[in-house]
């Protein structure tokens, strides 16, 4: 299997190829979920395993599962696990809708491809291996409800245009949206390009909208908050 290696801030190696790579949104989501040191975590549609690998890079010691429907993505994740010598991370090649496990998780994340309808472009066809077009927001929320501990957390990043669908899917599956944060490229950008949503299984009804996360400073470099997230 051909791949190249990216190295994260604290030395964790991530195997990637032309289909299974990672971008800024994976870093933002991995940070936003606030995973604690010993919690159990699942990443749905994990691709090359970047989100669980990032958790490990930041010192996470609990069990982390990278679930991916495409066997090539799972193979890349397994290579990364071997290279880094992680014994508390598991790569699973399966469809989340039919995956059965005795594990219950404190935190579940999902970073879906950002298209939902119409004819996908060639690159989008490659990306759809991960879990969409066929996996819906409702599928993710239903699986999360089944696999989360009580009051466990489901964190999703999506395009802002899909926010209503994410909230509806969560509430339909007894996951209460608790925190929303929009991401803007610059503080004067007219519209956000991403939204991060945190929902709790069987949570109470209350919602916090955090201040927008701004990607760039006035000089065009990364903002202080983004630099902290990357490092």
Labelled PLM ranges:
Residues 2-40, 46-48, 53-54, 212:
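SAM-dependent Rossmann-like transferase core, predominantly class I methyltransferases
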Residues 31-103, 107-110, 116-121:
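Conserved SAM/SAH cofactor-binding pocket of Class I
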Residues 13, 63, 88-90, 176-179:
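Conserved beta-strand segments of alpha/beta enzyme cores
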Residues 19-22, 136-185, 190-192:
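Conserved Class I SAM-dependent methyltransferase catalytic core
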Residues 9, 36, 59-61, 86, ...:
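Short, well-ordered coil/turn elements that cap or connect secondary structure elements
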Residues 112-139:
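Mobile active-site "lid"/loop adjacent to the S-adenosyl-L-methionine
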Residues 29, 111, 140, 199:
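Residue-level signal for inorganic ion chemistry
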Residues 188-231:
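SAM/dcSAM-binding transferase cores
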């Amino acid at each position: 299997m051909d791949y190249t290696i990216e190295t994260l801030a604290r030395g964790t190696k991530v195997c990637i190829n032309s289909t299974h790579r990672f971008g800024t949104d994976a870093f933002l989501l991995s940070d936003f979920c606030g995973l604690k040191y010993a919690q159990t975590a699942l990443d749905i549609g994990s691709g090359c395993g970047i989100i669980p690998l990032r958790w490990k890079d930041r010192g996470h010691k609990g069990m982390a599962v990278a679930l991916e429907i495409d066997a090539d993505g799972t193979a890349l994740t397994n290579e990364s696990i071997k290279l880094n010598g992680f014994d508390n991370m598991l790569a699973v090649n399966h469809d989340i809708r039919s995956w059965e496990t005795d594990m219950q998780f404190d935190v579940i994340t999902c970073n879906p491809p950002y298209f939902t309808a119409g004819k996908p472009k060639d690159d989008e066809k490659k990306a759809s291996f991960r879990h969409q077009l066929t996996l819906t927001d409702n599928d993710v929320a239903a699986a999360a409800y089944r696999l989360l501990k009580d009051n466990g957390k489901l964190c999703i990043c999506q395009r802002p245009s899909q926010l209503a669908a994410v909230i509806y899917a969560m509430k339909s599956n007894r996951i209460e949206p608790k925190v929303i944060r929009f991401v803007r490229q610059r503080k004067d950008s007219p519209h956000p390009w991403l939204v991060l949503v945190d929902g709790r299984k069987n949570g109470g009804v209350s919602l916090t909208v955090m201040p927008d996360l701004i990607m760039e400073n006035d000089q065009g470099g990364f903002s202080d908050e983004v630099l902290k997230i990357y490092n």
